[in-house]
C-alpha cells in the first residue's frame, strides 16, 4: 500500500476497514499510528474490532477477566443454564454440539456477570473496557468451539480442543493510547447514510468472496455477543443448527449482478482517495469484470498471487487459486 500511494508511513492518515472481520487489519493500522474507521455488519466482528482498535488493556479489564476466570474455576457457573447452554450445547435433550455443556455454562455465566457489572458499575466500567472484555469472551469461546472451520455446522463428536475448559484470556495486552477519532461501526456497508458520514485517505475492502453468508456461518458468536436479556427475541431458532431468523444477508454474496451493483455503490459513495480490494479467482465477480467496474472511477491495477484454498474438511482437495489485490486511485479526489 505504501508503494502504491507513495506514503512513507500511515501516521496522520485516516484508514477505512469496511469488512473488518477478525479485526487484525484494523489492529495493524492502529499499531502504525493511523486513525482507523472500521465497520462490519456482523455484531461479533464489530465488537472484536472495537477492542482491537479502541480499547486498552486497563487494570479494570485485567481485574474483571481474572475474576471471571476464578469464578468458573471455583465452579460458580455450574448452576447457570443460559441461552448458549440451552440451544448450542447437548444440554438435556438438545442435540446441538457447538460447545460442550461445561463450556456453554462458562460462556453463559461470564456473559451474565459482565452485564451485571456493566449495569452496577456504570461510572467505573467504560464502553471501551466493556467491549474489551466481551471480545475476550468471544475469542476464548471460539477457541473451544466444536466446528470444522466455521459455525455453519457442528461436528458429530467433540474434537480435542472443544473438550478443553474455556480459559478466559485478554484479547490483547496493548496499553498504548489510540489515535483520536478511531471508531468502529456495525452497519451494512451499503448504507449510504453511513458511507457519507466519514472521510478517509484509504479504504481497505475484504468482502465475502462467494455465496456463503457470514451470518449463517458465524451466528453462535453473534448470539454470545448480544446481551443475554435480548436473546429470547431470537426464538424460535431454525433447523438442526439453530440459526436465528434475523440473519443479515449480504449483497456481496449474491449472484446475478447483485454483487457487482454493491461494488459499484462502494466505489461511487466512499469518500476516499485510495481503495484496496482483496478478492480471488473463485469469487462471484471475475477479475476482468472487477477491473472494468473499477476503471470507471479511476486508475486501476491488480496484483496476483498463487495460493491453495483453505481446507476445512479432510476430504477437500487442495486447489490452486489466485488471490487478487485490486488497487483503485479514485480520480479527482
Model feature map: region roles:
Residues 248-297, 301-305:
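Conserved Class I SAM-dependent methyltransferase catalytic core
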Residues 287-333:
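Class I S-adenosyl-L-methionine
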Residues 35, 42, 46-174, 215-257, ...:
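Class I S-adenosyl-L-methionine-dependent methyltransferase module
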Residues 6-8, 192-199:
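Short amphipathic alpha-helix with an adjacent loop that forms part of the alpha/beta core around
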Residues 1-18, 24-32, 46-48, 55:
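S-adenosyl-L-methionine
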Amino acid at each position: 500500500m505504501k508503494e502504491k500511494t507513495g506514503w512513507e508511513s500511515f501516521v496522520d492518515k485516516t484508514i477505512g476497514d469496511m469488512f473488518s472481520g477478525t479485526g487484525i487489519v484494523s489492529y495493524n493500522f492502529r499499531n502504525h499510528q493511523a486513525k482507523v474507521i472500521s465497520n462490519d455488519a456482523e455484531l461479533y466482528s464489530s465488537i472484536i474490532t472495537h477492542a482491537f482498535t479502541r480499547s486498552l488493556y486497563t487494570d479494570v479489564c485485567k481485574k474483571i477477566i481474572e475474576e471471571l476466570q476464578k469464578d468458573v474455576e471455583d465452579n460458580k457457573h455450574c448452576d447457570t443454564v443460559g441461552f448458549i447452554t440451552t440451544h448450542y450445547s447437548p444440554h438435556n435433550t438438545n442435540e446441538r454440539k457447538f460447545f460442550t455443556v461445561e463450556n456453554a455454562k462458562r460462556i453463559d455465566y461470564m456473559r451474565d456477570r459482565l452485564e451485571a457489572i456493566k449495569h452496577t458499575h456504570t461510572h467505573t466500567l467504560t464502553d471501551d473496557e466493556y467491549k474489551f472484555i466481551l471480545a475476550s469472551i468471544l475469542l476464548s469461546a471460539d477457541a473451544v468451539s466444536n466446528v470444522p472451520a466455521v459455525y455453519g455446522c457442528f461436528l458429530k463428536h467433540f474434537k480435542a480442543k472443544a473438550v478443553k475448559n474455556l480459559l478466559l484470556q485478554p484479547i490483547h495486552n496493548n496499553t498504548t493510547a489510540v489515535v483520536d477519532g478511531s471508531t468502529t461501526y456495525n452497519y451494512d456497508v451499503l448504507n449510504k447514510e453511513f458511507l457519507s458520514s466519514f472521510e478517509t485517505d484509504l479504504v481497505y475492502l475484504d468482502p465475502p468472496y462467494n455465496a456463503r453468508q457470514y451470518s449463517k456461518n458465524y451466528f453462535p458468536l453473534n448470539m454470545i455477543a448480544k446481551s443475554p436479556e435480548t436473546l429470547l427475541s431470537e426464538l424460535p431458532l431454525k433447523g438442526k443448527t439453530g440459526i436465528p431468523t434475523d440473519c443479515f444477508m449480504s449483497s456481496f454474496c449474491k449472484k446475478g449482478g447483485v454483487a457487482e451493483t454493491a461494488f459499484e455503490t462502494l466505489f461511487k459513495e466512499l469518500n476516499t482517495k485510495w481503495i484496496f480490494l482483496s478478492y480471488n479467482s473463485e469469487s462471484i465477480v471475475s477479475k476482468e469484470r472487477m477491473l472494468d467496474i473499477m476503471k470507471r472511477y479511476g486508475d486501476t491495477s491488480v496484483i496476483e498471487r498463487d495460493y491453495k484454498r483453505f481446507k476445512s474438511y479432510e476430504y477437500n482437495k487442495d486447489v490452486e487459486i489466485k488471490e487478487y489485490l485490486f488497487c483503485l486511485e479514485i480520480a479527482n479526489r
